[in-house]
């Protein structure tokens, strides 16, 4: 990729992170921010918006670092194992392991008496479904060989990037961080070839 394309790619991901974080941020706290829009308190609206944009850009940078790690690990794994089928099996194992951990470990650490394990299942299931859809689109875009690796990025790498919010376990922060990370990772996965071709 040429330097101009790399810069455009970087700033495009920043924009995706800022946009999604702003939308999710206002949606999560709409009860609080609704009054600002009804009375059109522009100063406070823009103050909150700039904060969301800044946070979203941080999330997008985390996503880009995760994507770089993914590309590096993928390349090294193929060179060391010398078998794409073995690497795919390992990736599938990690995908299932992480998806289970997102449910079970969170339940162990944060579950309260009376809560069921099922209450912690929907976020990893949602992440898996989104990952499968994104990986399917990537497969259609390139080849069948990319499906498992794409799913690995969307589940395992996203979960690693999401760890700060998982550790805090604040519901608003869980959503505020997850959706931008998913969007940025999907954008990088699907749009990198188009930027590289320019």
Curated annotation (Swiss-Prot):
Name used for this protein in its record: KinB-signaling pathway activation protein
Give the subcellular location.
Cell membrane
Give the top-rank taxon of the lineage listed in the UniProt record for this protein.
Answer: Bacteria
Q: Name one GO cellular component term.
A: plasma membrane
Origin organism is: Bacillus subtilis (strain 168)
Q: What does this protein do?
A: Involved in the activation of the KinB signaling pathway of sporulation.
| Transmembrane intervals | 9-29, 42-62, 90-110, 117-137, 146-166, 173-193
Record flagged with keyword Transmembrane helix: yes
From the UniProt record, report the name of the gene that encodes this protein.
kbaA
Q: Which Pfam families match?
A: KbaA
Sorted UniProt keywords: Cell membrane, Membrane, Sporulation, Transmembrane, Transmembrane helix
SS bond list = none
List the GO biological process terms: positive regulation of sporulation resulting in formation of a cellular spore; sporulation resulting in formation of a cellular spore
């Amino acid at each position: 990729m040429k330097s101009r394309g790399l810069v455009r790619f970087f700033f495009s991901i920043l924009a995706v992170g800022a946009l999604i974080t702003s939308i999710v941020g206002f949606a999560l706290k709409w009860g609080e921010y609704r009054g600002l829009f009804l009375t059109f308190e522009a100063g406070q609206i823009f103050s909150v918006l700039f904060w969301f944009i800044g946070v979203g850009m941080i999330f997008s940078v985390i996503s880009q670092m995760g994507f770089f790690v993914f590309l590096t690990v993928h390349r090294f794994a193929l060179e060391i194992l010398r078998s794409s089928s073995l690497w795919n099996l390992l990736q599938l194992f990690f995908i299932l392991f992480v998806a289970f951990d997102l449910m079970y470990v969170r339940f162990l650490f944060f579950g309260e008496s009376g809560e069921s394990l099922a209450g912690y299942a929907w976020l990893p299931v949602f992440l898996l479904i989104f990952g499968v859809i994104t990986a399917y689109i990537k497969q259609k875009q390139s080849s069948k060989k990319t499906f498992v690796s794409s799913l690995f990025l969307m589940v395992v790498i996203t979960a690693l990037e999401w760890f700060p919010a998982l550790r805090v376990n604040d519901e608003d922060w869980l959503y505020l961080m997850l959706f931008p990370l998913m969007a940025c990772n999907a954008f990088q996965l699907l749009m990198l070839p188009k930027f590289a071709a320019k």
